[in-house]
Curated annotation (Swiss-Prot):
Annotated protein name in UniProt: Meiosis-specific protein MEI4
Primary location recorded for the protein, binned into one broad class: nucleus
Residues covered by region (Disordered): 86-110
Species of provenance: Homo sapiens
Protein family according to the UniProt entry: Belongs to the MEI4L family.
Listed GO biological process terms: DNA recombination; homologous chromosome pairing at meiosis; meiotic DNA double-strand break formation; oogenesis; spermatogenesis
Described function: Required for DNA double-strand breaks (DSBs) formation in unsynapsed regions during meiotic recombination. Probably acts by forming a complex with IHO1 and REC114, which activates DSBs formation in unsynapsed regions, an essential step to ensure completion of synapsis.
PANTHER family associated with the record: MEIOSIS-SPECIFIC PROTEIN MEI4
Lineage, opening ranks: Eukaryota, Metazoa, Chordata, Craniata, Vertebrata
Quaternary assembly: Part of the MCD recombinosome complex, at least composed of IHO1, REC114 and MEI4. Forms a complex with REC114; the interaction is required for MEI4 stability. Interacts (via N-terminal domain) with REC114 (via C-terminal domain). Interacts with IHO1.
Chain positions covered by the region annotation Interaction with REC114: 1-126
Key word Nucleotide-binding present: no
Domain of life from the UniProt record: Eukaryota
Biased composition (Polar residues): 92-107
Signal sequence, start to end: none
C-alpha cells in the first residue's frame, strides 16, 4: 500500500475513534460529526471574512501609496494637488430610473424603498476627495459597497493623468512595476464586482454601475495604462463582455426594457474603447450569425421559436450599429478586421440569409441589412486607404 494512502486511512480511523469516544450521550456519532463539521464551517467562514477585510485594507494602502508617490514624485509644485482638491467629486450618486416603460406605477412602499436605496448609494458610492484614501475599519463597510474604493482610486488616477501634460505619470508607472500592479489589481476587483452585478441586473439601476464601466473604458483607452491592465485582466474583460451579452439575451422578464437599455448602453460604453471594440463586434456578430442559422432552421421546419430571444437580438443590432458608426467616425475601419471569421461568415451569408428569411422575419432581415451596409462600407473604406 502507498505510504500516503496508509497515513490517510490511519488519520481517518483515528478521527472516527476520537469522535466516537468524545460524543455526548444524547447524540449519535453521525449527529455529533455533522455538528462538528458545522462548527468548523462557521469558523472557516469567520476567518475568510477577516481575510477579505484585511486584503481590502492592504489594497487601499497600496492605492494610497501609489497616489502619494505619484504626487510627491511628479507634482512637487503642488499644482495638481490643489487642482484636484478644488474640483468637486465626480458624480457617482445613484439616480433611480422611473418606470415609464413598464406601464406600472410605484406604490408608496416601493417609493420609500427606492428613496432608501438612493440614500444608500449616495452615502456609499460617492467618491470622497483623494487623498486621503479612507481605510475600511468595519466589515459592514466592505459588504455595503466593496467597489467604491476602487472606483475612487481609479477615477483619481484618471484625474492625475488628465492634469499631467509632461508625461511624468508614464515614467512613474514604468518605474514602479509593483505600483502599476496596484492599478491592475483594482481593475480586476472592479471587474469582479461588475460581473456579479450584471449577471442579474435589476431596477432601480444605479448610475454607479454605468460610471464604473465608463471608468474602465477610459483606463483601457489610455496608452500608458492599458498594457498593465490588459496583461492581467484580458480574460476577465472577455468574461465581462460575455456577461453583458448574456444579460441582454437572457432577459425574459415582462416590462424590463429599461434594464435592456442600460445594459446595452454599458456595452456601447465599453466598445467606445478602440482596444476592446474589435472583440466586442466579433462577439456580437457571432451571436447574430448563430441566431440567423437558428431562424433558418426554424423557417424550414415551420417550428416555434423563443420570442424573448428574438426581441432581445435587436438590442445587439443597436449596439453593433453604434460601434460600427463609431469606428467609421474615428477612421479606424481597418481595425475592424475583415479577416475575422465572424465578419467573414456574416458578409458571405448576408444576401442569402436576407432572401430566405425576409418573408417570415422581415424586421430581423431589415436590421441584418443595415448592419451589412455598415460593414460593407467599412470594407470599401479600408480598400480605398
Amino acid at each position: 500500500m502507498d505510504v500516503q494512502k496508509w497515513y490517510l486511512r490511519t488519520s481517518k480511523l483515528a478521527l472516527a475513534l476520537a469522535i466516537i469516544r468524545s460524543k455526548p450521550a444524547d447524540k449519535s456519532s453521525r449527529e455529533y460529526t455533522e455538528h462538528l463539521a458545522m462548527l468548523l464551517s462557521e469558523e472557516q467562514s469567520k476567518w475568510r471574512s477577516k481575510v477579505e477585510i484585511l486584503e481590502a485594507e492592504v489594497m487601499q494602502l497600496r492605492q494610497k501609496l501609489l497616489v502619494s508617490r505619484l504626487c510627491s514624485g511628479s507634482f512637487k509644485s503642488g499644482y495638481v494637488s490643489s487642482q484636484l482638491e478644488a474640483q468637486e467629486p465626480k458624480s457617482s450618486e445613484s439616480t433611480l430610473t422611473s418606470m415609464e416603460d413598464s406601464g406600472c406605477d410605484l406604490s408608496n412602499e416601493q417609493r420609500t424603498e427606492s428613496s432608501d436605496l438612493s440614500q444608500h448609494f449616495v452615502e456609499s458610492c460617492t467618491p470622497t476627495h483623494f487623498p486621503p484614501l479612507p481605510l475600511v475599519k468595519r466589515p459592514c463597510a466592505i459588504l455595503q459597497n466593496p467597489l467604491s474604493s476602487h472606483m475612487q482610486f481609479l477615477q483619481y488616477l484618471l484625474e492625475l493623468k488628465n492634469l499631467t501634460e509632461s508625461g511624468n505619470l508614464k515614467r512613474d508607472l514604468t518605474h514602479f512595476e509593483k505600483d502599476s500592479s496596484t492599478v491592475s489589481d483594482s481593475v480586476f476587483q472592479l471587474l469582479d464586482g461588475l460581473i456579479t452585478f450584471y449577471r442579474n441586473p435589476k431596477l432601480p439601476f444605479s448610475r454607479f454601475w454605468t460610471e464604473a464601466v465608463g471608468t474602465l473604458a477610459s483606463l483601457i483607452s489610455d496608452y500608458n495604462l492599458s498594457s498593465h491592465i490588459l496583461k492581467k485582466c484580458s480574460k476577465k474583460l472577455e468574461e465581462f463582455e460575455k456577461t453583458l451579452l448574456h444579460a441582454i439575451l437572457g432577459n425574459n422578464h415582462i416590462n424590463q426594457f429599461q434594464v435592456q437599455h442600460y445594459v446595452s448602453q454599458s456595452l456601447v460604453t465599453l466598445g467606445n474603447c478602440s482596444l476592446l471594440r474589435k472583440s466586442i463586434i466579433s462577439l456580437l456578430l457571432s451571436e447574430v450569425n448563430g441566431f440567423a442559422d437558428d431562424l433558418g432552421a426554424i423557417n424550414q421546419e415551420q417550428a416555434s421559436y423563443d420570442v424573448s430571444r428574438y426581441e432581445n437580438i435587436f438590442y445587439l443590432f443597436w449596439v453593433l450599429e453604434q460601434l460600427l458608426q463609431k469606428e467609421t467616425e474615428e477612421g479606424n475601419t481597418s481595425s475592424i478586421g475583415h479577416d475575422d471569421q465572424e465578419i467573414k461568415k456574416f458578409l458571405q451569408k448576408h444576401d442569402e440569409t436576407i432572401f430566405q428569411l425576409s418573408d417570415a422575419f422581415p424586421l430581423f432581415t431589415f436590421y441584418l441589412w443595415r448592419v451589412g451596409i455598415l460593414l460593407s462600407s467599412a470594407q470599401i473604406e479600408t480598400l480605398r486607404k
